[in-house]
Amino acid sequence: MKVKFLHWYNALAATLLSLLGFSSCGSEFGKDEPCLYGSPTSSFHAKGNVTAEDGTPIKGIKAVVVEDYGNAGCYRMDSAYTDSKGDYVTKEKSMDGAIDWVHKEKRLKVILEDVDDGANGGEFATDTIKSENITVEQVGKGEGTWDWGSFEVTANGKMKKKK
């Protein structure tokens, strides 16, 4: 009798668990969208103009976009070199999260480095453009739930000559 009871009990439990398993595969709140896992993403490019203190454009300056974590260090996101007009533009870069969050948290910086040893009209001291002097503008809407769109970072700088 005990064996027969366990047999029926196991059959009933297996049936109920199967039904519960299938019901959990249904749509969530009436939607037929899959659950999303991971991080939201966005893309950005940085641009700007670099001049000497007298307003002369500087060619060959390396502009490095960084996310500054304070004592934990910096994460170099992208870099570009200035042209003869002093302009630089980085390539479109994808990232987890959104660049405007980094900007609002005052962690976004652009480091300007003279890397050509005086070939651009003198040697210039390294300079940092901080978040307060950087603008971030959304230039494209994202598609879907996790794509937050594309952004344009603008950072212009004036560099001082080394003494």
Regions found by a protein language model. Name each.
Residues 28-36, 125-163:
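Extracellular beta-sheet/turn segments enriched in Thr/Pro/Gly and aliphatic residues
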Residues 89-107:
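Short Pro-Gly-centered beta-turn/loop motif in secreted/extracellular proteins
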Residues 26-45, 49-55:
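Beta-strand-rich domain onsets/edges
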Residues 52-72:
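Short, ordered, surface-exposed loop/turn motifs in non-cytosolic proteins
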Residues 71-94:
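Short, acidic Ser/Thr/Gly-rich low-complexity loop/linker segments typical of extracellular
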Residues 1-26:
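Sec-dependent bacterial lipoprotein signal peptides
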Residues 115-122:
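Short acidic/polar inter-strand loop motif in beta-rich domains
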